[in-house]
Amino acid sequence: MNLAAMDPKNYDAQLQQKRIKLEKAFADFNPPALEVFASEPMHYRMRAEFRMWHQGDDLYYYMFDKALNAKVRCDQYLPAGLIINQMMAALIAELTPNPALRYRLFQVDFLSTLSGEILVSLLYHRQLDEEWREQATQLKAKLSAQFNVNIIGRARKQKIDLDKDFVVETLTVNEQVLHYKQIENSFTQPNAKVSVKMLEWAIDATKDSQGDLLELYCGNGNFTIALARNFNRVLATELAKPSVDAAQYNIDINHVDNVQIIRMSAEDFSDAMAKKRQFRRLEGIDLDSYDCNTIFVDPPRAGIDPETLKLIQGYERILYISCNPETLNDNLLTLGQTHKITRFALFDQFPYTDHMESGVLLVRK
């Protein structure tokens, strides 16, 4: 993290640099005009992680600044949401004089929501005992006077939830209110306001869709829930069990009745669709009954494996959200053989960094 680069006065310039870089990187695919979705210039991150520095009686948060090649004290953190900055100050004031809570504490993670919840995870290089639980319970009671907070303690092979290990985010997407369970230590989009823009873009890109939707890498159902309105049915896959559980919870609380979640990898699902193997997890699900003309993918940074790319090429329309332009570019070398880009977007999920979130809609040539 380059803390010196995080100057709101430079926000527009850094976004323009990303625009130019992305347009240049994908020029060979002859995409349409790039749609650019900006972030707030400060207080945009809903989660943050800090290491803890113990110096005598003092205790403070720090991050490692790659530009300086040094640890930098962080009493406040400009990218983090206001609720995280407020909690940082309140929490450190309680931890510093409390031996039971600060002893061998090495990291603090914050997960917050636009709707006002915050989850604090305290990570230790020691096993947590009953004294820790008692002190943490008192800490939660004190902080609850100001925050809607839950606290988790973590150590090697140990996790203590004082109440729950998740928050519920509430987003307004095209005037529709959506609720999302977000679990501690699981992936969620860090920039909630840009996430809303991504959802609205995806809804618009698929608004004239016919038939059903197949989604790979669905996570906690972030896009699944929002896109369900545009399709008769949605079949979605995800491998991580906590994410599958959260996705099912989100389907229920949003009263969505046309989504089926399958817990399996994209690679295994590709084998199932090609009828190379049979899977017990697919018992009772008639894959042939789905009329999927559109496929949606939001893969990890490594991109999509060759077999899954072959599966994806079989669909008329491909909606691809990418957190890594390099692997998207590589995947488009294959997908571009059969499909052309009709929508092209940049979402500034990570201001002041080199990371770029992008989206493309591809239609069969």
Swiss-Prot record:
Its EC number is 2.1.1.-, 2.1.1.35. One of its GO terms (molecular function) is tRNA (uracil(54)-C5)-methyltransferase activity, S-adenosyl methionine-dependent. Disulfide bonds: none annotated. This is tRNA/tmRNA (uracil-C(5))-methyltransferase. CDD domains: AdoMet_MTases. One of its GO terms (cellular component) is cytosol. PROSITE patterns: SAM_MT_RNA_M5U, TRMA_1, TRMA_2. The keyword Chloroplast does not apply. S-adenosyl-L-methionine binds at Q189, Y217, N222, E238, D298. Keywords: Methyltransferase, S-adenosyl-L-methionine, Transferase, tRNA processing. GO terms for biological process: tRNA methylation.
